[in-house]
Amino acid sequence: MAIGTPLLKGSIKFLLLGSGELGKEVVIEAQRLGIECIAVDRYQNAPAMQVAHKSYVIDMKDYDALMAIIEREEPDYIVPEIEAINTDALIDAEKMGYTVIPTAEATKITMNRELIRRLAAEKLGLKTAKYEFADSLEELRDAVEKLGLPCVVKPIMSSSGKGQSVVRSEEDIEKAWKIAKEGARGIGNRVIVEEFINFDYEITLLTARTAEGTKFCEPIGHVQIDGDYHESWQPHNMSAELKEQAQDIAKKVTDALGGYGIFGVELFVKGDEVIFSEVSPRPHDTGMVTMITQEMSEFEIHVRAILGLPVSTKLIHPGASHVIKAEINKYAPKYHIEDALKVPNTKLRLFGKPNAKVGRRMGVALAYADSVEKARELAEKCAHAVRIE
């Protein structure tokens, strides 16, 4: 393929929908290959906007606003980075001849827990948690009774653990309904109710669909707090048999979704069984660890796969990531990083978010070592040494 020059006739254009920390790294990798990048989000000065050639601030759930930018910019690739996007606009753009990554249909299916669960469990026959759906508090009570306690309640559409809760007693049901409604994205009150799986561990299996075929990164282990990523490490130690099971599930799901790019396939492991949880058709937050562990990060893999270029998923050494969270609410925060940078074998990535909020991810510490355990220690030490004021 021939790559033109950014901002000149013949350039290759990425229209990035969503401009958070993951999108920022995608833009940086695309820029390195001479791709013209346009970043879109609902607020000004979002992380990816700071490194893109051009940016727009719109509500991406607004069909007309989104279509207006697509028609104005005429991108070669529309690259969703978040889930709060009007998928009807993506489907129509695809019909008009635009390339949506990985596909418009894949974007629609994966942002809706009902659609992806029905695809995985009912169409593909994959092992998942038992589940029910509910549209009212009464239906939720019935679903909980069917599945038994404890169980997990999630909005059909939400992100980063928003709206999720565990129901451990009948007294929790009404509270879970309220939490789901408050955390939901989009219209309607529909929720998915899942059996609580007391898993041994959970992993993300980064799966790249490329012109050369499907490739897998080494499994990534992670810790979630309130459904949100807190730390991750690679490789996560698992048997060859379980890894093969995980890859088989990931390939079936990503083949069904189609298109090119990287997918973050989330899986539970319990005993000798791998259970499908969810999938994101884009780089995954737990995959930030690949910036220090692999020959190519998940972001470089994503960009190369989109463009049909060669991809490597080779692991260089064990490593870990640990999030840096704000402990204050402040606009235009400042960072003290001197002590963090004294920690050996580590790197920092500050996201550049204009607003610090208590509990918000503002950066990530990355570390490598001879073992995952040592890397986790170093990453945590580095992250906790950053002071935000």
Curated annotation (Swiss-Prot):
<comment type="subunit">
    <text>Homodimer.</text>
</comment>
<feature type="binding site">
    <location>
        <position position="266"/>
    </location>
    <ligand>
        <name>Mg(2+)</name>
    </ligand>
</feature>
<feature type="binding site">
    <location>
        <begin position="159"/>
        <end position="164"/>
    </location>
    <ligand>
        <name>ATP</name>
    </ligand>
</feature>
<comment type="pathway">
    <text>Purine metabolism; IMP biosynthesis via de novo pathway; N(2)-formyl-N(1)-(5-phospho-D-ribosyl)glycinamide from N(1)-(5-phospho-D-ribosyl)glycinamide (formate route): step 1/1.</text>
</comment>
<dbReference type="GO" id="GO:0000287">
    <property type="term" value="F:magnesium ion binding"/>
</dbReference>
<keyword id="KW-0547">Nucleotide-binding</keyword>
<dbReference type="Pfam" id="PF02222">
    <property type="entry name" value="ATP-grasp"/>
</dbReference>
<feature type="binding site">
    <location>
        <position position="202"/>
    </location>
    <ligand>
        <name>ATP</name>
    </ligand>
</feature>
<dbReference type="InterPro" id="IPR013815">
    <property type="entry name" value="ATP_grasp_subdomain_1"/>
</dbReference>
<keyword id="KW-0067">ATP-binding</keyword>
<feature type="binding site">
    <location>
        <position position="278"/>
    </location>
    <ligand>
        <name>Mg(2+)</name>
    </ligand>
</feature>
<dbReference type="GO" id="GO:0004644">
    <property type="term" value="F:phosphoribosylglycinamide formyltransferase activity"/>
</dbReference>
<feature type="binding site">
    <location>
        <position position="81"/>
    </location>
    <ligand>
        <name>N(1)-(5-phospho-beta-D-ribosyl)glycinamide</name>
    </ligand>
</feature>
<feature type="domain" description="ATP-grasp">
    <location>
        <begin position="118"/>
        <end position="307"/>
    </location>
</feature>
<feature type="binding site">
    <location>
        <position position="353"/>
    </location>
    <ligand>
        <name>N(1)-(5-phospho-beta-D-ribosyl)glycinamide</name>
    </ligand>
</feature>
<feature type="binding site">
    <location>
        <position position="113"/>
    </location>
    <ligand>
        <name>ATP</name>
    </ligand>
</feature>
<comment type="function">
    <text>Involved in the de novo purine biosynthesis. Catalyzes the transfer of formate to 5-phospho-ribosyl-glycinamide (GAR), producing 5-phospho-ribosyl-N-formylglycinamide (FGAR). Formate is provided by PurU via hydrolysis of 10-formyl-tetrahydrofolate.</text>
</comment>
<dbReference type="GO" id="GO:0005524">
    <property type="term" value="F:ATP binding"/>
</dbReference>
<feature type="binding site">
    <location>
        <begin position="21"/>
        <end position="22"/>
    </location>
    <ligand>
        <name>N(1)-(5-phospho-beta-D-ribosyl)glycinamide</name>
    </ligand>
</feature>
<dbReference type="InterPro" id="IPR005862">
    <property type="entry name" value="PurT"/>
</dbReference>
<keyword id="KW-0436">Ligase</keyword>
<feature type="binding site">
    <location>
        <begin position="360"/>
        <end position="361"/>
    </location>
    <ligand>
        <name>N(1)-(5-phospho-beta-D-ribosyl)glycinamide</name>
    </ligand>
</feature>
<protein>
    <recommendedName>
        <fullName>Formate-dependent phosphoribosylglycinamide formyltransferase</fullName>
        <ecNumber>6.3.1.21</ecNumber>
    </recommendedName>
</protein>
<keyword id="KW-0658">Purine biosynthesis</keyword>
<feature type="binding site">
    <location>
        <begin position="194"/>
        <end position="197"/>
    </location>
    <ligand>
        <name>ATP</name>
    </ligand>
</feature>
<keyword id="KW-0460">Magnesium</keyword>
<keyword id="KW-0479">Metal-binding</keyword>
<feature type="binding site">
    <location>
        <position position="154"/>
    </location>
    <ligand>
        <name>ATP</name>
    </ligand>
</feature>
<dbReference type="GO" id="GO:0005829">
    <property type="term" value="C:cytosol"/>
</dbReference>
<dbReference type="InterPro" id="IPR016185">
    <property type="entry name" value="PreATP-grasp_dom_sf"/>
</dbReference>
<feature type="binding site">
    <location>
        <position position="285"/>
    </location>
    <ligand>
        <name>N(1)-(5-phospho-beta-D-ribosyl)glycinamide</name>
    </ligand>
</feature>
<dbReference type="InterPro" id="IPR011054">
    <property type="entry name" value="Rudment_hybrid_motif"/>
</dbReference>
<dbReference type="InterPro" id="IPR003135">
    <property type="entry name" value="ATP-grasp_carboxylate-amine"/>
</dbReference>
<dbReference type="Pfam" id="PF21244">
    <property type="entry name" value="PurT_C"/>
</dbReference>
<dbReference type="GO" id="GO:0006189">
    <property type="term" value="P:'de novo' IMP biosynthetic process"/>
</dbReference>
<dbReference type="GO" id="GO:0043815">
    <property type="term" value="F:phosphoribosylglycinamide formyltransferase 2 activity"/>
</dbReference>
<dbReference type="InterPro" id="IPR048740">
    <property type="entry name" value="PurT_C"/>
</dbReference>
<comment type="similarity">
    <text>Belongs to the PurK/PurT family.</text>
</comment>
<dbReference type="Pfam" id="PF22660">
    <property type="entry name" value="RS_preATP-grasp-like"/>
</dbReference>
<dbReference type="InterPro" id="IPR011761">
    <property type="entry name" value="ATP-grasp"/>
</dbReference>
<dbReference type="InterPro" id="IPR054350">
    <property type="entry name" value="PurT/PurK_preATP-grasp"/>
</dbReference>
